[in-house]
Structure formats: structure tokens, C-alpha cells
């Protein structure tokens, strides 16, 4: 049974106004579409004990309309034969999935780990898929902060998106969280300049910077997003939009906005801020995307 979401007239007006910035996201689907029309996303992560992270990202990608989604786990064998509640998601080991050539976009790092196997998988993806959009989050960012070879490979990606929280940003810059937070705009621009990437600096009023230093300040969201797995969901949302062909900067900005706006919808509909589960975000984002598209 689908949750019942709603928005007040003023909230709806404000969200519709913001959505005008994201024309590729809120475009109605053609009636003759098929699953291949909406791309294939690969989510790579899930070391032992962290199998839930890629599941959150992959399920979010499905909710946001991706045609097909793979989840790859950095383990010798798959942690489960099928994901309970999400049989639509295809499963593979991380090293095997990294070799596929039919992937339209990648999300790498959700619970990946930072050991030798993780570094090798990340390096392989960055080497073999330089022409595809690649979102790096969590442990993938931690590897970049310590491994010079992988850092150089990342710079060679044409459509790279980094999604650090302040601590990950500090590690990438070799500085402190306090210094990042003292000037978030400078931090997000510097990371973008170092990697030639679009950067999503998460936190209150998430910042998105393009490689040419255009800055988007996200105004959506609330404290309910301060929950484990929220960042994995954001990565899955952005990856889903990329796989569907949304331009990189628009996908990053719209993903950040939808992620926050979904939490706002949940708060307005059910009064939930404290105790919001990460897995509850994407269904609200799906509802919002469809509601806005219908209204455009």
C-alpha cells in the first residue's frame, strides 16, 4: 500500500517554482518508452557488514525511475540471492559488475570499504568507464583522500560527481571539518578544481558546484535527513537521474533538491522529522517527481 503524501497550496507553489530549474527531470515520459529508455545504473559498494548501503542506493534509483539497476557487493559471494522487497534489483559481486560495458552511470562507494579489493574495484571502474557519469561517495572518497593513483584516475573521468559530507571533504582537502564549515563555498569550489568534478557538499543547505564553479544552494530538507543511510539514498537518486540522461549538473542539483524536498513532504504529510528512516525518503521523492511532472 502506498503512503499518503500531500502538500499545502503554498508548499506546492514553491516546489513547482523550484522545479522549473530542472526541465529534464520533470519531463513527461513518452508513451512508447521501454525500460531501456531510462538507462542502467550500477551501484557498487557493500563490503561485509555494510550490505544495506548499496541496497538503499539501488532501491532509491528504482523509485526515481531508472530502467534497470545493478547492485554490486564487495564480497567474495553475494550476501543474499535476492533483495527482500526489491526483486527488481539485479545482483553481482563488485569486481564482476565493474567489468560490465552496458552501464549508463555508476554510483561507487556505499559501504565499499577501503581495503585492497575496494581500491582495485574503484580503480578498475575509473579506468574502464571514463566516458560514463560516475558518482563517488563514502568510502570511494576516503580512498581518493589517501591513494594518489586512484586520485589521478578520478581526474580522468569526464563526468565525475563527488558527494562528500564535511568530514569527507576535509579529508579530500587535507584540512579540518571546522575549516570546511567555516567557508563551505570555498571548500566545494576547491574540491571541484582539484578533481575537475561536480561536487555536492552535503549538510544544511547543501552546495553543488560545477567544474566551472557555478554554485547551486539547495534550500530543501530538514533535520530528519540526519539519519544513517540518507547519503546512500542521495547517491542513488543522483545516479538514477544520470542513467536516465539528465545532464550532470542538473542531476546533481535536482537530486539534492528532491532528496531534501522528499523529507519536507514526509514532515508535512506525517509530522515525522525525528526517527525518519533512510528507506522512507525515496518513495516520497518518487511521489513528488510524478506530482510535479503532472503539474508542469
UniProtKB/Swiss-Prot annotation:
AMP binds at residues 202-206, 231. Signal peptide: none annotated. One of its GO terms (biological process) is nicotinamide nucleotide metabolic process. Keywords: ATP-binding, Lyase, NAD, NADP, Nucleotide-binding. CDD domains: YXKO-related. Residues 18-292 form the YjeF C-terminal domain. (6S)-NADPHX binds at residues 53, 113, 165, 232. One of its GO terms (molecular function) is ADP-dependent NAD(P)H-hydrate dehydratase activity. Its cofactor is Mg(2+). Its EC number is 4.2.1.136. The keyword Cell cycle does not apply. Pfam families: Carb_kinase (PF01256). The keyword Lyase applies. InterPro entries: CARKD, Ribokinase-like. PANTHER family: ATP-DEPENDENT (S)-NAD(P)H-HYDRATE DEHYDRATASE, ATP-DEPENDENT (S)-NAD(P)H-HYDRATE DEHYDRATASE FAMILY MEMBER. Belongs to the NnrD/CARKD family. Homotetramer. Catalyzes the dehydration of the S-form of NAD(P)HX at the expense of ADP, which is converted to AMP. Together with NAD(P)HX epimerase, which catalyzes the epimerization of the S- and R-forms, the enzyme allows the repair of both epimers of NAD(P)HX, a damaged form of NAD(P)H that is a result of enzymatic or heat-dependent hydration. This is ADP-dependent (S)-NAD(P)H-hydrate dehydratase. It comes from Neisseria meningitidis serogroup B (strain ATCC BAA-335 / MC58).
Amino acid at each position: 500500500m502506498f503512503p499518503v503524501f500531500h502538500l499545502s497550496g503554498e508548499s506546492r507553489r514553491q516546489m513547482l517554482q523550484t522545479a522549473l530549474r530542472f526541465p529534464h527531470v520533470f519531463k513527461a515520459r513518452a508513451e512508447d518508452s521501454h525500460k531501456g529508455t531510462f538507462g542502467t545504473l550500477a551501484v557498487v559498494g557493500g563490503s561485509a557488514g555494510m550490505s544495506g548501503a548499496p541496497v538503499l542506493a539501488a532501491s532509491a534509483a528504482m523509485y526515481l525511475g531508472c530502467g534497470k539497476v545493478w547492485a554490486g557487493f564487495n564480497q567474495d559471494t553475494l550476501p543474499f540471492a535476492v533483495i527482500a522487497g526489491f526483486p527488481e534489483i539485479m545482483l553481482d559481486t563488485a569486481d564482476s559488475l565493474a567489468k560490465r560495458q552496458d552501464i549508463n552511470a555508476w554510483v561507487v562507494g556505499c559501504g565499499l570499504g577501503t581495503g585492497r579489493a575496494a581500491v582495485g574495484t574503484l580503480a578498475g571502474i575509473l579506468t574502464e568507464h571514463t566516458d560514463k557519469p560516475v558518482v563517488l561517495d563514502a568510502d570511494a572518497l576516503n580512498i581518493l583522500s589517501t591513494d594518489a593513483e586512484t586520485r589521478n584516475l578520478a581526474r580522468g573521468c569526464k563526468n565525475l560527481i563527488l558527494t562528500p559530507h564535511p568530514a569527507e571533504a576535509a579529508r579530500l582537502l587535507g584540512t579540518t571539518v571546522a575549516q570546511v564549515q567555516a567557508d563551505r563555498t570555498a571548500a566545494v569550489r576547491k574540491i571541484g578544481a582539484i578533481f575537475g568534478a561536480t561536487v555536492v557538499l552535503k549538510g544544511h543547505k547543501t552546495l553543488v558546484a560545477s567544474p566551472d564553479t557555478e554554485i547551486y544552494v539547495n534550500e530543501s530538507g530538514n533535520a530528519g535527513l540526519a539519519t544513517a543511510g540518507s547519503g546512500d539514498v542521495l547517491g542513488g537518486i543522483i545516479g538514477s537521474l544520470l542513467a536516465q540522461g539528465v545532464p550532470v549538473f542538473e542531476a546533481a542539483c535536482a537530486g539534492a533538491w528532491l532528496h531534501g524536498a522528499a523529507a519536507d513532504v514526509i514532515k508535512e504529510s506525517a509530522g515525522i522529522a525525528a526517527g525518519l528512516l533512510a528507506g522512507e525518503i525515496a518513495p516520497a521523492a518518487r511521489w513528488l517527481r510524478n506530482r510535479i511532472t503532472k503539474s508542469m
